[in-house]
Design a protein with these regions (language model features):
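Short proline/glycine-enriched turn/loop motifs at strand-loop junctions of beta-rich domains
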Residues: 72, 118-125, 155-158
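Hydrophobic membrane-insertion alpha-helices, especially the h-region
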Residues: 5-24
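Short, surface-exposed beta-strand/loop "edge" segments at domain boundaries and coil↔beta transitions
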Residues: 62, 70-78, 98-100, 124-126, ...
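Extracellular ectodomain segments of secreted/surface proteins
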Residues: 91-116
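N-terminal hydrophobic targeting signals that begin at the initiator methionine
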Residues: 1-2
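Ser/Thr-rich low-complexity repeats and stalk/linker segments
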Residues: 126-173
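Exposed regions on extracellular, virion, or secretory-pathway luminal proteins
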Residues: 83-86, 95-99, 133-134
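N-terminal export/targeting and maturation segments
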Residues: 18-92
Length: 173
């Protein structure tokens, strides 16, 4: 009888180990509730690349993050709200830091264009939407605080031209 009890105890311990690991892994996953947690989520995207979030903004409850990597890249990441203040990565667009990132996502049934540039210190950006058979529309945004531009649009067929300007008038396209 003692041998059966010992085998039962060993079996239960082995079962707890096998069941406990996935449960522990699930509980320790980053939940996106803090900037540090969202960085962990970004660091899981690509092996070996370390991301640091440098700017964030809220758009209708979604967190839009701008991050830079240890490999000279920049990224716009969109985090979708979940229950209890948690966030899930919805989309991420990565480019070389010297390039202007143009990305987009649907938030609450509205398409948003997201634009961010890490290549130089800039003061403003001019965005021109060109729509067939419609007069082009231009908007100017201040960008002196590492701002991610979030531009809602109802256009379905359009082109987008973005030009950043620094304090000396230099253009970045």
């Amino acid at each position: 009888m003692d041998k059966k009890k010992a085998l039962l105890i060993v079996f239960i311990i082995i079962l707890l180990i096998f069941l406990g690991r996935p449960i522990l892994w699930y509980c320790m996953r980053p939940d996106g509730a803090t900037m540090e947690s969202r960085e962990e989520i970004l660091n899981d995207i690509k092996d070996g690349t370390r991301w640091t979030i440098t700017t964030e903004r809220l758009v209708e409850g979604y967190v839009i993050s701008g991050a830079v990597s240890d490999r000279g890249e920049a990224m716009i990441a969109v985090f979708e709200p979940k229950e209890n203040g948690k966030y899930k990565l919805q989309t991420a667009t990565r480019r070389d830091k010297e390039e202007i990132i143009i990305s987009g996502s649907i938030i609450n049934d509205v398409w948003y264009d997201f634009i961010w540039f890490q290549g130089a210190s800039t003061e403003r950006a001019e965005i021109i939407y060109t729509v067939p058979n419609v007069t082009s529309q231009s908007s100017v945004y201040l960008t002196d605080n590492d701002t991610i531009i979030c531009s809602p649009t109802t256009y379905k067929d359009y082109t987008l031209q973005v030009t950043y300007f620094d304090s000396e008038g230099n253009k970045y396209e």
